[in-house]
Amino acid sequence: DAYSRIFARCGIPEVAIVKSDSGMMGGSISHEYMLLTPVGEDSIAICPECGYSANVEAAPSIIKNENKIPKEELKEVSTPGTGTIEELCDFLKIPAENTAKAVVYQKNADDSYIVAFIRGDLDINETKLTNAVGEDIHPAVIEDDSILTAGFIGPVGISDKVTVYFDNSLEGIDYLVTGANKVDTHYTGFNVERDCPDAKYVDLAKITEGGICPNCGKPVINISRGIEVGNIFQLGTKYSKAMNFTYADENG
């Protein structure tokens, strides 16, 4: 309320209170005050039905899949010149929703590879992936002599030196196309549950325009732009525990 009164007295219009990621500050809960404007540097997910609002970095992505292609056996196929999802879909005549896209990062500490698999029509939310990994990461540089084959990376047969994550968007899809870890080669008929039975799903996707609201469940999310003009953090005992801060109460 204090922030809201300050903004009102300053004559700042349309300041939205949105859920956000705590980032470096830490703590379990944080909220940002966003001045809504088309030239804002941040993206905000807003539900016009129930009023839910969150920075896209913190907004859960809820995906409901429909199986339009029936389950098939895993099959290695030649796919020359298909290093992107668009080229692959055009070559095989399939929708991007039936592809498992590999997005590659490296840990800042040791440059080890992290591969996040996500439905081909969606994008990775780097904040969510950073939180899942538990340390800082950066987009990968894949050299010619790398253990990864750029443009054709897949979970079947991938090096055990690579940390692999599967986004929730792949759960329950019967038929997927994914890289075969060889140049100009993909697997068709890939099924996560069958072909990678130990896979664990994590929410890594960016919420999208028209996406499902995490609060009311309606597919009406709007993505707006905003400028952060305030931020509050619920730190709890994050810093007091880390620094072993204690005090003597009336009982000593």
Report the location of each language-model feature.
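Extended, low-hydrophobicity, polar/charged segments
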Residues: 1-252
